[in-house]
A protein has these predicted regions:
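Terminal amphipathic alpha-helical/low-complexity segments used for targeting or macromolecular assembly
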Residues: 1-56, 96, 129
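Flexible, glycine/small-residue-enriched loop-and-beta-strand segment within the central core
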Residues: 35-43, 63-74, 78-134
Length: 134
């Protein structure tokens, strides 16, 4: 999935970095400037980049998503403006769960016991009908 030895090279392969570049361009042009009510459009765009988004999910335009292909959003879930989904690994948000403004879900950290501090990732799962607040 990724290089754990960041001393020998970047943590993620070129393909991943190019995909994130394409996502960031699409996000800047087609996702973030959309009106708040266009949840279906944003869900479609996320699906086009590999996310799994359930019916009637509300993903607001101010959400920042690192890698949509690592995102799964359940039916009727809500992700508010100002949320950061740092999805270096999988983020699964259950049905009818809410991620409130200012929440930051981060799947990555660094091994501070190693001299090169290599990247370490673990998935995050937010259960059904849960509420994550900042």
């Amino acid at each position: 999935m990724h290089n754990t030895d960041t001393f020998t090279g970047p943590s993620f392969p070129l393909r991943n970095r190019l995909a994130r570049l394409a996502w960031n361009l699409a996000c800047a042009i087609l996702f973030r400037p959309t009106p708040v009510f266009m949840h279906a459009w944003r869900a479609w765009l996320l699906r086009a980049f590999g996310a799994r988004v359930g019916r009637h999910a509300h993903v607001y335009p101010g959400v920042r998503i690192w890698a949509p292909w690592n995102l799964e959003v359940g039916e009727e879930a809500g992700i508010a403006d100002g949320v950061i989904l740092y999805s270096q690994d999988r983020i699964m948000i259950g049905r009818r769960a809410v991620i409130s403004q200012g929440a930051h879900l981060c799947t990555g950290t660094h091994d501070t016991s190693h001299p090169w501090h290599p990247l370490m990732t673990k998935p995050i799962s937010v259960g059904e009908q849960s509420w994550v607040a900042a």
